[in-house]
Amino acid sequence: MTEKNISEHGISARSRANLLEAMHGEAFAFAKYKLFAKQARLHGDNELGNLFDKTADQEYMEHFTEQADLVQLAGTDEQDVTDAISGESFEVDTLYKRFAEEARADGDEQVAHRFEEIRRDEAFHQLAFQEALIKLQTRDRTMKGSMGRSAKAHDF
């Protein structure tokens, strides 16, 4: 592997892209299997519900989290909140707005309404993360200013 193929995460760009795609699949499988587990239990099949739950947990706890570690998905709290704001902003400003418009243009009013409802929820998420970022930044400035240094774990 040549140096120009190595990303800032120490892996090739193609491997990183493959890991991210795999993570999307694992996350979707987790959510889908949790839904299937609930449905199986509603139909009286606890054994099948347990199988779906067990598989869902493995998809998340092993596959997704191990892949997330390889791509260094999580960073500092401030980085993670900034990433969350970016994702929520995209959903509010672009994704769900476009989806609602397209559904309405196709005559799928119920789908358009659902996308608009979700868009409003995402706007609340966006605001909550923006407020969290302000608190993080204020806390960090206060801690650095009052101690004259960054706080360490042994300080608490």
Which functions belong to the PLM regions below?
Residues T2-F156:
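Non-heme di-metal
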